[in-house]
């Protein structure tokens, strides 16, 4: 059903979002990844990455020293500068730890397409060291089910993407906020 060219709220879409979140929570075998980056313009690189498990335990948390410029707008959001990251390891040094944390788990990310694009660019830059990346499970996006859960119509059809509620623009804070969001959806609240 459409009203003024906008798709109306669909209870089935909300129910599907709740079912997706419940499947995650009931399995307990997933992790949430979040990152902060150098900005939106290429090249884009990680400056901070965090992974939490279904119990909100921090599996990985760390900053990353990029080898490209950090956009001023990104710094205003997450606070990282080239100077503050000077002592951080480059991506290739933390990559084995990230693989271990993500291996054989469902990986959930808020706005997964963006983080996965940055991940894929980072892994490609590793050359042969990145060959195992193709073995990771696909990443699941929490933003899309949450948009359907909220049910706010988009002018382009479907549902309007929502900002991550309660995120603080740190990788760990946003990973925990995404986990809480999944738990909230699973409860149907």
Where are the regions that the model predicts?
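Short acidic, Gly/Ser-rich segments with clustered Asp/Glu that frequently serve as metal-coordination loops
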Residues: 35-43
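Conserved phosphate-coordination/catalytic loops
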Residues: 12, 85-92, 169-172
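Short glycine- and acidic-rich boundary segments immediately preceding or forming the N-terminal edge
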Residues: 1-24
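Metal-dependent phosphoesterase signature
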Residues: 76-97
């Amino acid at each position: 059903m459409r009203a003024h060219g906008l798709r109306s709220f669909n209870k089935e879409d909300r129910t599907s979002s709740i079912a997706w979140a419940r499947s995650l929570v009931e399995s307990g075998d997933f992790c949430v990844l979040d990152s902060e980056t150098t900005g939106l313009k290429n090249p884009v690189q990680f400056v901070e990455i965090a992974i939490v498990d279904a119990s909100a335990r921090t599996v990985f948390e760390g900053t990353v020293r990029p080898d490209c410029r950090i956009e001023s707008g990104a710094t205003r959001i997450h606070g990282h500068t080239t100077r503050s990251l000077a002592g951080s390891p480059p991506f290739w040094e933390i990559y084995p730890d990230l693989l271990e944390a993500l291996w054989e788990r469902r990986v959930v990310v808020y706005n997964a397409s963006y983080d996965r694009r940055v991940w894929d660019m980072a892994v490609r830059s590793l050359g042969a060291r990145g060959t195992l990346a193709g073995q990771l499970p696909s990443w699941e996006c929490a933003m899309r089910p949450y948009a359907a859960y909220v049910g706010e119509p988009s002018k382009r059809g479907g549902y309007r993407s929502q900002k991550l509620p309660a995120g603080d623009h740190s990788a760990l804070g946003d990973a925990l906020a995404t986990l809480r969001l999944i738990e909230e959806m699973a409860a149907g609240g």
